[in-house]
Structure formats: structure tokens, C-alpha cells
Curated annotation (Swiss-Prot):
Prosegment residue ranges: 83-86, 122
Source organism of this protein record: Lophius americanus (American angler)
The name this protein goes by in its record: Glucagon-2
Induction details: Produced in the A cells of the islets of Langerhans in response to a drop in blood sugar concentration.
Record's keyword terms, sorted: Cleavage on pair of basic residues, Hormone, Secreted, Signal
A GO cellular component entry from the record: extracellular region
Organism placement in taxonomy: Eukaryota, Metazoa, Chordata, Craniata, Vertebrata
Signal peptide coordinates: 1-21
InterPro entries cross-referenced by the UniProt entry: Glucagon (IPR015550), Glucagon_GIP_secretin_VIP (IPR000532)
Annotated PROSITE patterns: GLUCAGON (PS00260)
Length: 122
């Protein structure tokens, strides 16, 4: 079975190789196809170049506008009053944390005072 597969593969390879080596017999037909192909590609090439340059310009301009919008947004953030709100919130959080710490410390001091026996009335 393996030899049959090998023989079939070898025959297929020979057929493909012979078709690559056999040139077209009609030289007039080849020159006519060449002329038609060259006529088709000549006008398309400048159009492709024009489209490429327009695409490049559009891409660069889009990147510029995107950068400009980002800069304007950052400037707006700097000038807005939202920074003050965040600062006040942060100050309030700090004050609240300090108050909680002081209350915990006062509770610990009170418990240690009670343990020492100073809180008893005799």
C-alpha cells in the first residue's frame, strides 16, 4: 500500500513538473496578453499612488487631531474645579482617619487606667 502511494505521488510530481516546463506555443497571444496587462496597469499605478498619499495624509492628520484632543482634555482637567473637590475629600478622609486613631488610643488609655485600679471608688 505504501509503494502504491509513493508511485502515485511520483506520477503526480512528474505531471506537475512537466506542465511547468511546457511554454505556451503561441507567441502572438503572449505579446497580446502582455500589451493588455501593461495597458491595464499603467493608469492604475498613479491612482494607487494618489490613494496612498491621501491615506497617509489622512492617517497623519487623524493622529494630530487625536493628540490635540488629548492635550485639550488635559488642559481642561487642569483648569476645572474638580481638583478642589478631590482635595477636600482627601482632607476629610485624613481628618476622619486621625479622629478614629485618637479615639482608639483614648479607649486603650482608659482601659489601661481601669486596669491600674485608679478608677475604683473606695
Amino acid at each position: 500500500m505504501t509503494s502504491l502511494h509513493s508511485l502515485a505521488g511520483l506520477l503526480l510530481l512528474m505531471i506537475i513538473q512537466s506542465s511547468w516546463q511546457m511554454p505556451d506555443q503561441d507567441p502572438d497571444r503572449n505579446s497580446m496578453l502582455l500589451n493588455e496587462n501593461s495597458m491595464l496597469t499603467e493608469p492604475i499605478e498613479p491612482l494607487n499612488m494618489k490613494r496612498h498619499s491621501e491615506g497617509t495624509f489622512s492617517n497623519d492628520y487623524s493622529k494630530y487631531l487625536e493628540t490635540r484632543r488629548a492635550q485639550d482634555f488635559v488642559q481642561w482637567l487642569k483648569n476645572s474645579k474638580r481638583n478642589g473637590l478631590f482635595r477636600r475629600h482627601a482632607d476629610g478622609t485624613y481628618t476622619s482617619d486621625v479622629s478614629s486613631y485618637l479615639q482608639d488610643q483614648a479607649a486603650k488609655d482608659f482601659v489601661s487606667w481601669l486596669k491600674a485600679g485608679r478608677g475604683r471608688r473606695e
